[in-house]
């Protein structure tokens, strides 16, 4: 025959290499029996072998095995069989994957491929070996004791391959949290140093002084092209959302099963669905629990359900009787099924920008890709929209790698296009539904207001400025600031207006004056909380006004407003609908009119203070405040409370300035000596700053002068005493000694006189009058 048999390490593993010879199954025979069968075979000799492509390192075990045939006996060389025998064993399977068992695979019929594909030195094989993708991963450890969580391994069955591979990534480790290193990756460099064997890799990774470790890993590029990364799948499936899962699952279960050649439908009922009820089709979203599966989405409520599709999609094509646990893998459920099942009910006409040809081509490419990936090239029939059921032609003259590259390129292009189209469609539908909901809400409020008898009108509480907006340059009176939301405080004590108006709801509008925020009050069904959403579309408002607020009612028809978090801020206050009419008072308090009859004609000016029952309305205890947007020096904005008094004073100052300016051209008549001068707020600030600086300057001068005098006193010597002063001091000392001797007090000296030195004689007192 011109070739030698390969030697397997274990004779009982012979079935892993050679499957059939001239249609006779050899998987259960020993090596000697296989050799005898080869010798006894007649020409032409057709041998079916099992080979694993070397470019699928690191892939899951369900893709490591591919079934190929040789054309004639001279196309298989000894070197090729030896290379197949030296391939490393498959990597450990993932937790949710089951390895293929050859006995569970469907029977293999003869296939003929290009013999040049199996030559060891062929250009395609060399090209495949070089199709590697390199990625640099940097892992950071918090301390030296932390482990990366990588189990490195090397090959023992091939001396030429000295590469270091990642055998396992421990869950909840640093490498697993990073997510870029996967099982089967080859480690090329560690911290910029090439590693040749396992000892070098372990030595570098276990160094205690290294906390940041940079790894250069390589993996087959086709592995990344065949399967989506988890991040890409999540990003793509986020566009569809979880709301279409129920519709997608029902659509897949309703699709008719696909016919299949062979007896691989064993164990599955004829005509029934390909999967049991307990098994769920994986659409790539990753939802497994019932609570998430039954969850409803707001977008699903708005967009509505699409009609179920009866077109065969890859979601239904997957169910061709393979019910064994060995075939229940994540990669077997192709991720693009969600896209096709979603668009199957739409058709190419409902996707603007995607023609019918592109749509059908996209489906066909995905189906081909699914079948090629999972080794099910034979016996698969799929339906096309243009021409019913037709068999998939698998006798291709071009190589599998070239075909897969073309498929990947076209799939990426169409996938990107479909993603953008579907995203734009969903956004457009969402906008339309929101617009309809807003219009229905507004119409219901208008109808509610029109149906009620119009007993009275309650205007919003606002302040009439002293001047019109067009004549004022105040920041408080500009168009935008007048629309600022007023402060909401506790309602007024119950009045006849409120008692008579209970149960009635009106739309409060201000027919004139500056625009103010309106509070919508409706009457929903009793016992149910009012929860709705209002979308502001007034271009003059310039900002979104409010979202929803829960209004809970007690049995005594009392209204409690519940605010959570930032909703308590009046800057973010909301529209209210209540069963009773609620009264608000804003920046400036406005008391209710005298009677209900005078409500429409009551004066709203600040000068005429309304009275109730002849008694003036009670003033607000707390100072009236309002919200104002302030700007910091760095340009950022913040909201602060400011008393209304500041705004009134500023408006008064502007009015005074306008009255005093431009009256005459006589400089003497408008001089500050006669008219006085009004200092603005900025000028008063400058005055305070200058006064503070002058006071500091005076204090500094006084302190300097005192220090100077103190230095002069300490530096000069004691001055010499004058002789006259010394004589005077001595005389006074003698005199005092005579008068105040023996502790004679002044009173005694004045009353009784002075004693003599010996104490025997007493002189006349000083106050006695004598004549000479």
Curated annotation (Swiss-Prot):
Keywords: Coiled coil, Cytoplasm, Phosphoprotein
InterPro entries named in the record: E3_ubiquitin-PDZ_ligase, PDZ, PDZ_sf
Modified residues (Phosphoserine): 242, 459
SMART domains, alphabetized: PDZ
Any one of the GO CC terms: cell cortex
Pfam families for the chain: PDZ
Signal peptide as annotated in the record: none
Region (Disordered) location: 239-320, 450-573
Locations listed in the record: Cytoplasm, Cell cortex
Key word Cytoplasm present: yes
Biased composition (Basic and acidic residues): 287-303, 452-472, 535-552
Keyword hit for NADP: no
Compositional bias segments (type: Polar residues): 473-484, 502-511
Origin superkingdom: Eukaryota
Coiled-coil residue windows: 394-424
Stretches assigned to the PDZ domain: 136-221
Stated name of the protein: PDZ domain-containing protein 4
Protein source organism: Mus musculus (Mouse)
């Amino acid at each position: 025959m011109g070739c030698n048999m390969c030697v397997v390490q274990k004779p009982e593993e012979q079935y892993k290499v050679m499957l059939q010879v001239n249609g006779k199954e050899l998987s259960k025979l020993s090596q000697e029996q296989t050799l005898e069968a080869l010798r006894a075979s007649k020409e032409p000799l057709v041998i079916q072998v099992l080979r694993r492509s070397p470019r699928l390192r690191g892939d899951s075990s369900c893709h490591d095995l591919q079934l190929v045939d040789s054309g004639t006996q001279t196309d298989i060389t000894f070197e090729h069989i030896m290379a197949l025998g030296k391939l490393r064993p498959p990597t450990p399977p993932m937790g949710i994957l089951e390895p293929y068992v050859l006995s569970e695979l469907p029977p293999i019929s003869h296939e003929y491929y290009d013999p040049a594909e199996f030559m060891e030195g062929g250009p395609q094989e060399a090209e495949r070996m070089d199709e590697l993708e390199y990625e640099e991963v940097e892992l950071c450890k918090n301390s030296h004791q932390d482990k990366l969580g990588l189990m490195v391994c090397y090959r023992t069955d091939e001396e030429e391959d000295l590469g270091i591979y990642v055998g396992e990534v421990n869950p909840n480790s640093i490498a697993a949290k990073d997510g870029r290193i996967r099982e089967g990756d080859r480690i090329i460099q560690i911290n910029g140093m090439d590693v040749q064997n396992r000892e070098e890799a372990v030595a570098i990774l276990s160094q205690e002084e290294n906390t940041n470790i940079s790894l250069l890993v390589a993996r087959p590029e086709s592995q990344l092209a065949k399967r989506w990364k988890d991040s890409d799948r999540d990003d793509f499936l986020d566009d569809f959302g979880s709301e279409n899962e129920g519709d997608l699952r029902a659509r897949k279960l309703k699709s008719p099963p696909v016919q299949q050649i062979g007896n691989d439908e064993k164990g599955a009922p004829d005509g029934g669905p390909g999967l049991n009820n307990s098994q769920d089709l994986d659409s790539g979203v990753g939802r497994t629990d019932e609570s998430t599966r039954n969850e409803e989405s707001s977008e699903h409520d708005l967009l509505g359900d699409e009609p179920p599709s009866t077109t065969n999609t890859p979601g239904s094509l997957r169910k061709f009787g393979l019910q064994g646990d060995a075939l229940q893998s994540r990669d077997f459920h192709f991720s693009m099924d969600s896209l096709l099942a979603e668009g199957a009910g739409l058709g190419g006409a409902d996707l603007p920008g995607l023609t019918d040809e592109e749509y059908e081509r996209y489906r066909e490419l995905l189906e081909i890709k699914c079948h090629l990936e999972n080794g099910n090239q034979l016996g698969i029939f799929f339906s096309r929209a243009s021409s019913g059921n037709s068999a998939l032609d698998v006798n291709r003259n071009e190589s599998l790698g070239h075909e897969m590259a073309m498929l990947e390129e076209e799939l990426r292009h169409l996938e990107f296009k479909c993603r953008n189209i579907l995203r734009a469609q969903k956004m457009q539908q969402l906008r339309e539904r929101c617009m309809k909901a807003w219009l229905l809400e507004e119409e219901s409020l208008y109808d509610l207001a029109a149906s009620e008898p119009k007993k009275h009108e309650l205007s919003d509480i606002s302040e009439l400025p002293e001047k019109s907006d067009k004549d004022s340059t105040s920041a408080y009176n500009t168009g935008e600031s007048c629309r600022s939301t007023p402060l909401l405080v506790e309602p007024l004590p119950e009045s006849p207006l409120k008692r008579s108006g209970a149960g009635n709801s009106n739309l409060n509008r201000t027919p004139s004056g500056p625009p103010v925020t309106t509070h919508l009050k409706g009457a929903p069904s009793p016992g149910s909380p009012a929860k709705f959403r209002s979308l502001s579309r007034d271009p003059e408002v310039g900002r979104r006004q409010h979202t929803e607020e829960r209004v809970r009612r007690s049995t005594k028809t009392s209204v409690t407003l519940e605010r959570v978090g930032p909703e308590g801020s009046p800057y973010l206050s909301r529209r209210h609908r209540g069963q009773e009419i609620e009264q608000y008072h804003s920046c400036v308090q406005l008391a209710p009119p005298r009677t209900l009859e005078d409500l429409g004609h009551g004066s709203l000016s600040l000068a005429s203070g309304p009275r109730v029952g002849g008694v003036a309305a009670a003033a607000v205890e707390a100072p009236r405040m309002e919200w104002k947007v302030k700007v910091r020096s760095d340009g950022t904005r913040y909201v602060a409370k400011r008393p209304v008094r500041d705004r009134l004073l500023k408006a008064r100052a502007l009015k005074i300035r306008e009255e005093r300016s431009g009256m005459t051209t006589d400089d003497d008549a408008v001089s500050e000596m006669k008219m006085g001068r009004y200092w603005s707020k900025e000028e008063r600030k400058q005055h305070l700053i200058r006064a503070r600086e002058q006071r500091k300057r005076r204090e500094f001068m006084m302190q300097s002068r005192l220090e100077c005098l103190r230095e002069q006193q300490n530096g000069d010597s004691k001055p010499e005493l004058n002789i006259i002063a010394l004589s005077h001091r001595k005389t006074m000392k003698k005199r005092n000694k005579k008068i105040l001797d023996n502790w004679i007090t002044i009173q005694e000296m004045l009353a009784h006189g002075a004693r003599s030195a010996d104490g025997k004689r007493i002189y006349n007192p000083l106050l006695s009058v004598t004549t000479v």
